[in-house]
Amino acid sequence: MIRRLVCLCLVFAGVVLFPFRSPAPLIYTPGEGWQYEPVGGGGNWQRQRAKDQLIVAQDAFDKKDYSLALKAARRVVHIWPLSDFAPQAQFILGRCYETKGWDEKAFNEYQVLLEKYPKAVHYDEVLKRQYEIAVRFMNGEWFRVWDYIPLYPSMDKTADLFEKIVKTGAFSSVAPQSQLKIGETREKQGNYADAAKAYELAADRYFDRPQIAADALYKEGLAYKQQAATAEYDQNTAAQAITVFTDFMTLYPDDTRVPEAQKIIAELRREQARGNLEIARYYERRNHVEAARIYYNEVVTLSLAEPNSTYAETAKAHLTDINARLRKENAQKENGAK
């Protein structure tokens, strides 16, 4: 213990009594963050005019020196944020991060460009780049923690990226597809209700683009169909799916998917018939015959296209039995009244 204390005292004395020069390659600048400066570098990349500083950033980017490009571009947007050169510098920031594979940071820098410099010449290109980044995340790219550590894929965060694209450029060339992608990300989560809402919004907002609107309406119907398959006794979503597919066939009768939509409607009606049959049996087992009869009749109605189906035949048989029982009970009541 004493020996360790003596050693610590000697080290402390050496540091205090024998100072030495040490290069400081890490320099912190407010607004620019920590920067690495090689020994003797002296900040030779810094310029006193925005235009000259942007030239340094662009030249460095063209030479694939992304560290220098980031420093120089960051300096432009920090010191000269209102200059004519700031938008291009902000664009270079996004391009550097995207090239380095830091897609989330790139997306965020592009978002700053769109919000802070909406008249920038790269507006459409930036939206397209954001869309491509969001698609990469939808396809499984991992989000990073502290900008460095890839940790997990996230459909929630991916949907947020697409929503930002739609909000920023609602009528841009990539906005319709971005709105559809929101629905796809929700489907990947198994969140079919939100997926259907996203598709519905796409169909309503871009009704004047027939291909987009038709795709949105068809996918909305599929989302409701998927949701109906997970709801054992709730037939409302099946009815919604049928309504959407019916609208799809009415609005786009020449679409090649119409025959498939017709098949799906038939499947959904069978599903509705099955669900109503289960409910009818439930009430019949508890001797609620009037309620049971209502649901058996609904099964028959839903099976008009397939009157000889198993569900229809079963419902008809139960209706015959229930009606016979009710007639018998009514007759007994009448006889008792006499």
Can you name each region flagged by the protein language model?
Residues 2, 20-338:
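Acidic, polar-rich low-complexity tracts and alpha-helical solenoid repeat scaffolds
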